[in-house]
């Protein structure tokens, strides 16, 4: 069986997020930044949705192995693409999920408006991932200095993301 490791607690986050969304069999769902496609496989198995498992860092050829191993090749379609250059038509998806990936590409002021064009009007966009309890202002606390490297500067607090998304005027948060 192909490896399914990837983002920390991706399946737990997917289960939690999906519980807050109205996913129904046959819906077309974009799983953006799906990593090794474990969240996509889960969504197909649990909800019967069709999933476009889209990731930049893991190849579609690698992900299809896991998808086949899971027996969901009929409803999970691996795509290798950059989140900032998606190959989909406007309003193609019924829903979009981003599990433990949005912070890597979504902090640009214009990104949410770009992403929203791919979901049908009033379609849900669900985002779950790691973050900060509060923003780090000023010097980094001693206990975080070793951990606080460029790799994690993209992490923000829930209140930061709320302000970031609310100002677009296109999402109910």
Predicted regions located by residue number:
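Class I SAM-dependent methyltransferase Rossmann-like catalytic core
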Residues: 1-8
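Conserved alpha-helix/loop element of class I SAM-dependent methyltransferases that forms part
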Residues: 8-25
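Class I SAM-dependent methyltransferase SAM/SAH-binding core
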Residues: 30-32, 36-85
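A short acidic, Gly/Pro-enriched loop at the edge of an enzyme's catalytic core
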Residues: 84-96
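A short SAM/SAH-binding and catalytic strip from SAM-dependent methyltransferases
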Residues: 95-107
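A short glycine-rich, Lys/Arg-flanked "PGG" loop and its adjoining helix->strand segment in the class I
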Residues: 109-124
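Short, glycine-/aromatic-enriched active-site segment of Class I SAM-dependent methyltransferases
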Residues: 130-152
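Short alpha-helix
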Residues: 153-169
